[in-house]
């Protein structure tokens, strides 16, 4: 008689997918890097044109890191080696509010950049009716950038429209 034995898993949770390291865009070791696959899923960026997306991520990281440079300097002076070491004001799903808002800001800059490219000169007359919807999407992403940065810094949100 032959038999097969196996151990049942401890829980029914599926293991987290392993994303390829080649899709990672690191950011100087202090700020968290961005995985292009996770970004595509989060902001519904179509696959393809990976190098353009990588460039958009690099530029977004530079933009947001620049806006948060003074805050970072204060944290480094306080002895924190990276953003993940800074105690969050609140932790959601195992991530600090700082980490979540960093990713929201970077992802929103990328989404706005991708949206602006879609609105660019290659837009045909057949797609002109989508122009306003695309512009509205870009505006929402830019608003999300501003909100994420202000929330990160603990500043109140400001919404103003030109009349």
Question: Which residues does each PLM region occupy?
Answer:
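Conserved short "hinge" loops at termini or chain/domain junctions
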Residues: 1-86, 91, 147-163
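Short loop/turn elements at secondary-structure junctions
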Residues: 94, 98-163
